Amino acid sequence: MENNIQNQCVPYNCLSNPEEILLDGERISTGNSSIDISLSLVQLLVSNFVPGGGFLVGLLDFVWGIVGPSPWDAFLVQIEQLINERIAAYARSAAISNLEGLGNNFNIYVEAFKEWEADPDNPVTRTRVVDRFRILDGLLERDIPSFRIAGFEVPLLSVYAQAANLHLAILRDSSIFGARWGLTTINVNENYNRLIRHIDEYANHCADTYNRGLNNLPKSTYQDWITYNRLRRDLTLTVLDIAAFFPSYDNRRYPIQSVGQLTREIYTDPLITFNPQLQSVAQLPTFNVMESNAIRTPHLFDVLNNLTIFTDWFSVGRNFYWGGHRVISNRIGGGNITSPIYGREANQEPPRSFTFNGPVFRTLSNPTFRPLQQPWPAPPFNLRGVEGVEFSTPLNSFTYRGRGTVDSLTELPPEDNSVPPREGYSHRLCHATFVQRSGTPFLTTGPVFSWTHRSATDRNIIYPDVINQIPLVKAFNLTSGTSVVRGPGFTGGDIIRTNVNGSVLSMSLNFSNTTLQRYRVRVRYAASQTMVMSVTVGGSTTGNQGFPSTMSANGALTSQSFRFAEFPVGISASGSQGASISISNNVGRQMFHLDRIEFLPVTSTFEEEYDLERAQEAVNALFTSTNQLGLKTDVTDYHIDQVSNLVECLSDEFCLDEKRELSEKVKHAKRLSDERNLLQDRNFRSINGQLDRGWRGSTDITIQGGDDVFKENYVTLPGTFDECYPTYLYQKIDESKLKSYTRYELRGYIEDSQDLEIYLIRYNAKHEIVNVPGTGSLWPLSIENSIGPCGEPNRCAPHLEWNPNLDCSCRDGEKCAHHSHHFSLDIDVGCTDLNEDLGVWVIFKIKTQDGHARLGNLEFLEEKPLLGEALARVKRAEKKWRDKREKLEWETNIVYKEAKESVDALFVNSQYDRLQADTNIAMIHAADKRVHRIREAYLPELSVIPGVNAGIFEELEGRIFTAYSLYDARNVIKNGDFNNGLLCWNLKGHVDVEEQNNHRSVLVVPEWEAEVSQEVRVCPGRGYILRVTAYKEGYGEGCVTIHEIEDNTDELKFSNCVEEEVYPNNTVTCNDYTATQEEYGGAYTSRNHGYGKSYESNSSVQADYASVYEEKADTDGRRDNHCESNRGYGDYTPLPAGYVTKELEYFPETDKVWVEIGETEGTFIVDSVELLLMEE
């Protein structure tokens, strides 16, 4: 009876919500926070396993900087809910409290480390980082045992792994940087020994506890297997994956970056719909069936290529579902492997075959439960199956029947959530197994997906600049007697077991270097007896080498069981090569375990010996004696950096001890160089970073990191379009650092320059213009590896050398800058006076459009005491300077008094907050002109540097600016000087705004029908003065009218043919007004800002004003400076004849008036319009 059939579909997520699990009657949302954090950490360990601040910051960002009490609790709950076991309250509280404390102390340690890394020679930073290390190290030694409290080891295991990883990271820091921190050799070695001991201890605990946690779970029902698999998966992600990288913290075994891979397989939940609260497990496979059918036996690593799905159906209601499938994969370097049929090769629909051509990083599945009512008298039938899946690769999606809602990313989230999942995914689909159970009246079927970590690449790529770790399960062939077995838990995947006496395995390698490169080879192994092994790559072999036993016969595999078989003879290879491992002398057929093979790039012996000898000679030549107490005076900072490059390029494999010794000597030389250098911020950390010290410069200067010429930061100075506003860089050497009657030297290195001016200024200016032609890159065209993999310069590649000895002499015993890359300029210092604090100004300047410069390694250091002629010469220069200073002080007193009186007359009181009622713009300009008669307010060589009279000049100039601001506040006309074009003005017809005489803007009304107007808000009943400065050309009249809506109209008329009545002192008003407007060129508010900012508070305006005058003021009288006239402080151009100023009084009756500008004939030119509020 067809109409009695009921076909009901219950969605997967309605029956079982994987995000919520009941534990002791409490519903807990699990989420994936701990898994997210662990995946991000693994990404860091895979991609950036390099000691230093970058790694520590990553560790802080990914783990310790984002977790707090709640996330740490989530780590614990994640496991608690799976094993159905609560941690005792005291243990939980202690663990979370300890984790918080460790996180806080790690944050402080990272701050101290970064501070030391930025200033490694500072004893304060060294002391701080050592103190923070010892505190954090002590806390970790104390607290890690609290994460393995007896009885709660399993739920605490994920936080144990995080704390252990942190401890190994800082122990590695102390082993690498301890000597530079000031730790003794004994202390450094002790820390290294603890590091090695803890690597084994922590790895063993993680693996043992993992296995114990799984063994303690029940293993009977389907639901037992679900819990078992989830715990296995979660502990793999949060514990074992991290523990797999513990051995890489051995910095002496991994002195450079290493790249590891995780080949383990993990399984997402079966795509079977089941609700344990409502349904019986009798219709589902048992634990043993699930484990044997869903989990693959250990095997060589393979890559999924194709998946063919067969569709089955249940006749009642024609319900189609995934009935079976076949997988085609390949081993790396091997051919395709076709799996047996999983499930049934059904044919209810044509098979669907998917060739992915890329990693499948996501599945969206549609598992369903359909309770079907069969025709009477048949019993109801429960059908569980998968009705559709969408497979996603980074480029495409492949859909079998339909897309579902069960997302694999909920169980295996991305490792990087800052990018789309197609880029930040953590796992890729590796295989699909199948489980089913049928009976009366039910059928349960569903695929189970297995996944591998993305770090396990689909090729065995060997890079020439890192230590390459290749798991041996990535071989493509094993000989008889060799097999893959389960890994012990801390290896990141399965391992190889063999008892052969001969060839063990074959694998395919891809060397990224296209020319022959030499590599050292080592194999991680465990053996109960001596083993003789060899590795062959292409036509190159290591030869047979004997290696000792590592464990007792039949002993358990622990972290201590594994050691490295390091071959003294390396191999040479490039491109694609086959590789094999062989074992000989295994007559007794003892069992050996092999984990991974590692390739370490090395150079030839001859080159290594030559480089070592060359580096030793260069280092010894830096010092005055063999005890390295002092540097030779002619050893420059740049030369020390080049010697440092020589040492850094020595082979770690060939001469590691010698390299370390030479490196310490070079570092000592660098510290001595820094100590004698009187410049602040010698490494260009910032420009304008600190107001009272360091480098100051124009904003167009850039600081760039080291390149093929400079090891450290250097600066680039571009050209300028206006020589009055040059590109500049300067610093003052404080008087307290100088010695009396001593010669000092400025020197450095110029990569290239054009029109670079260098000044040393004390009593007078020592000045040189330096043009140094650049030679382009130091790398010859034949060198292919001049750039490293991250874009950094490869300073170890062969390169061209410039002559470091070029120099020239200006006078016997003196030095000057010239056209060589090394420049030197000296200056003599007479008697020092801390009160005067004259110091020495170091200036670099470019004032041409084609000018440019790149320079670094700057030094200012003591050269020698002055004697004889040089001493007499500096004394004469000092006396001449003091005579000039006395004359200047006498002149300044007179000029200052006049200027101050003129400025004070503008205001009503000494608070300078209110103008006199009769103060007009002409009076302000006249006072300003007197202020600018003060000489030596700024240095003529660079007008941003304050001179001897800067204080009094800025004092008066600040009051002048206040006067301008107060005057502007009385003028209610916006943009009355037309410096902002026609902004705020209404326009009818055609008018122009033109620039005349030093960028002064005027309004030109050329046509009688044109009109310009502005609506102005006023205060009814108050008095206003309308003042207009204008010029009329030709016949007719120019008119400026002010009126209200109705009546109350007044106007000012301008004519060219009739002598107009002018305001008193009209000529002075016109000329001074124009001249001083040109002088300021935008220095005060209404000329320097749009009107959105013109009426802000004086405090914000003053800040802008200070920078303007720091840039522009230049009245030093040391030499003629033609930029003075351009800035308005020398000769100025008055208004042409005919400009007049008129004004009238106006009393509005409403709050709104209109000011209109027009003419009757000819051309009307308006310089400014002012509407001033009368004083009450």
From Swiss-Prot:
GO BP terms in the entry = sporulation resulting in formation of a cellular spore; symbiont-mediated killing of host cell
What does the protein in this record do? Promotes colloidosmotic lysis by binding to the midgut epithelial cells of insects. Toxic to Spodoptera exigua and Trichoplusia ni.
Organism placement in taxonomy: Bacteria, Bacillati, Bacillota, Bacilli, Bacillales
Q: Gene behind this chain?
A: cry1Cb
Q: What family does the entry list?
A: Belongs to the delta endotoxin family.
Q: What else is known?
A: Toxic segment of the protein is located in the N-terminus.
User: What is the protein's species of origin?
Assistant: Bacillus thuringiensis subsp. galleriae
What protein name applies here?
Pesticidal crystal protein Cry1Cb
Q: Which Gene3D superfamilies match?
A: Galactose-binding domain-like (2.60.120.260), Pesticidal crystal protein, central domain (2.100.10.10), Pesticidal crystal protein, N-terminal domain (1.20.190.10)
Among its keywords, does the record have Plastid? no
Alphabetically list the UniProt keywords: Sporulation, Toxin, Virulence
State the Pfam families in the record.
Cry1Ac_D5 (PF17997), Cry1Ac_dom-VII (PF21463), Endotoxin_C (PF03944), Endotoxin_C2 (PF18449), Endotoxin_M (PF00555), Endotoxin_N (PF03945)
**Protein's UniProt keywords contain Cell wall biogenesis/degradation:** no
Read off the InterPro entries from this record.
Cry1Ac-like_dom-VII, Cry_V, Galactose-bd-like_sf, Pest_crys, Pest_crys_Cry1Aa_dom-IV, Pest_crys_dom-III, Pest_crys_dom_I, Pest_crys_N_sf
| MF terms in GO | signaling receptor binding; toxin activity
